[in-house]
């Protein structure tokens, strides 16, 4: 039988078995998953892109709501 794939938890670095048995993958625990979610919510993580503001991106695209 082959060895299960192991990855590092993105939050704490602990080894994590990548399998259907691990409901938190790629995280080692619910705690690490929630820490990562909190970091995204606090805008500590960002997806690379241009620095255009939302107003510039969407101005004139939609009719104003009344």
UniProtKB/Swiss-Prot annotation:
Domain of life, per lineage: Bacteria
GO biological process: regulation of DNA-templated transcription
Cofactor annotation comment: Binds 1 zinc ion.
UniProt keyword Zinc present: yes
UniProt keywords, alphabetically: Metal-binding, Zinc
Cited InterPro entries: DNA_gyrase_inhibitor_YacG, Znf_NHR/GATA
Gene Ontology molecular-function annotations: DNA topoisomerase type II (double strand cut, ATP-hydrolyzing) inhibitor activity; zinc ion binding
Description of how the protein assembles with itself and partners: Interacts with GyrB.
PANTHER family: DNA GYRASE INHIBITOR YACG
Name this protein carries in UniProt: DNA gyrase inhibitor YacG
Organism: Pseudomonas putida (strain ATCC 47054 / DSM 6125 / CFBP 8728 / NCIMB 11950 / KT2440)
Encoding gene (name): yacG
């Amino acid at each position: 039988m082959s060895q299960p794939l192991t990855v590092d938890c993105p939050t704490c670095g602990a080894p994590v078995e990548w399998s259907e048995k691990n409901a938190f993958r790629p995280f080692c625990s619910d705690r690490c998953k929630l820490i990562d979610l909190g970091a995204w919510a606090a805008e500590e993580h960002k997806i690379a892109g241009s620095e255009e503001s939302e107003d510039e991106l969407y101005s004139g695209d939609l009719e104003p709501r009344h």
